[in-house]
Amino acid sequence: MIIMALHILRRGKMTSKFVQKINSVEWLLTDGATGTNLFDMGLMSGDAPELWNEKYPEKIAKLHKDTVDAGSDIFLTNSFGSNALRLKLHNFGNKAFKLSKISAEIARDIADYSDRTVFVAGSVGP
């Protein structure tokens, strides 16, 4: 899906920093294995990773920082399941907006901390 989006953007006339970047390089490195890494950090199977945005923001920040330090040009927010239906399963359906906002703020802080241009993409699940 990301490759398709990059192909479409390369053909366009947009001038955003992101489009300028993808037009100037052959490839961009993205993050991966977010769930696996969160399990390694203590997330339990069945838990909602999005709740960690508020409960353990330092762990989410470390996850993103490690991704950037490893060379990622783009990384996703910790918000894939941050919607009312998914969070309702954990009795936090009313916190979807707040948790999504926190995930974006944590990610943006880490991207801005980098000494190079790093892009943050919102992760939106079903």
Regions inferred by a protein language model and the residue ranges of each:
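Domain-level signal for soluble alpha/beta catalytic cores
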Residues: 3-126
